[in-house]
Amino acid sequence: MQLAQRLCELLMCRRKAAPVADYVLLQPSEDVELRELQAFLDENFKQLEITPADLRTFSRDTDVVNHLLKLLPLYRQCQSKCAFLKGYLSEGCLPHTRPAAEVECKKSQRILEALDILILKLVVGEFAMSEADSLEMLLDKFSTDQASLVEVQRVMGLVDMDCEKSAYMLEAGAAATVAPPTPPAVVQGESGVREDGETVAAVSAFACSSVSDSLIPEETGVTRPMMSLAHINTVSCPTVMRFDQRLLEEGDEEDEVTVMSPSPEPVQQQPPVEPVQQQPQGRGSHRRRYKESAPQETLPTNHEREILDLMRHSPDVPREAVMSPTMVTIPPPQIPFVGSARELRGVKKKKPTAAALLSSA
């Protein structure tokens, strides 16, 4: 019943105000923000000694207060973020997350430092921020700077690593090219050590890589190098060929020449020398073998035998002298060493005549 009555009064606008009514006047929001800002400044900027009277003065300048109020939540957010990252780094941070946490912590510290400068300049009045300059742009600037610094450090690290690797490769290449000098090779033959590798450099000056075998015949008097010419592909060494005197070509008996070196001493008879073993000779030999000088023993020829037969039948000649003929020893002719064996090739050995045999007997 009462509800219907009140509804009718409300519709007919007949309701009156109660005689006792309590109205509470709420404080404006600006005072709450100023108190919060005062607490923030006392907490972080106590050294500035900003009093409430100063804040009332600042309140007259709405731009300064508005900017300070905008910076307040951002500052507290960066503070909490930096405190969390410092605690995370100090309490068992994972190895793979430590670089990222360090970067974010440094970024938060840099933002806090920049906000400190902004607040100080706003309070002092030497800095004014326009409405167009938002805090997002400021954060983007600092984040871009931090990212740029990180990228620059990363690039510098890669450059340093590249320099180290390049230096290592260059040092390794130089050590490989500069090898220690090899000792000279010593060539040994039948007569012992001949000469070092520098002298006996028996390589061809114009050797071709297509040569499959040595160009020096096996039966010549020229010693072969240690390796065949097929393995030589350089033209840096001169041609040095050694002549072996023991491998001279021996011709027939009529063309054989006996050569001895001249000496001021008188020629003496020497004991017989063992015959030299004949070795196979090649076609390209242009030298002749020098045999050691020794006296030659010759047998009587047919003409000498006829003379001996006549002397046996002659009664005036003693029989012992005829029956026991001695071997005639002919000393070697003293021919001086003139020219090469090719030049001496034309010298023929003269056969002893009967008159020479008789005179020697």
From Swiss-Prot:
PTM (free text): Phosphorylated.
InterPro entries per the UniProt record, alphabetical: Herpes_U44
Ranges that cross the membrane: none
Keyword list, A-Z: Host cytoplasm, Host Golgi apparatus, Lipoprotein, Palmitate, Phosphoprotein, Virion, Virion tegument
Signal sequence, renumbered to the chain: none
Keyword NAD set for record: no
Region of interest called Disordered, as start-end residue ranges on this chain: 251-299
Role according to the record: Plays several roles during the time course of infection, including egress of virus particles from the perinuclear space and secondary envelopment of cytoplasmic capsids that bud into specific trans-Golgi network (TGN)-derived membranes.
Subunit structure: Oligomerizes. Interacts with UL103; this interaction mediates UL103 incorporation to virions.
Family per record: Belongs to the herpesviridae UL51 family.
Name of the featured protein: Tegument protein UL51 homolog
Source species: Human cytomegalovirus (strain Merlin) (HHV-5)
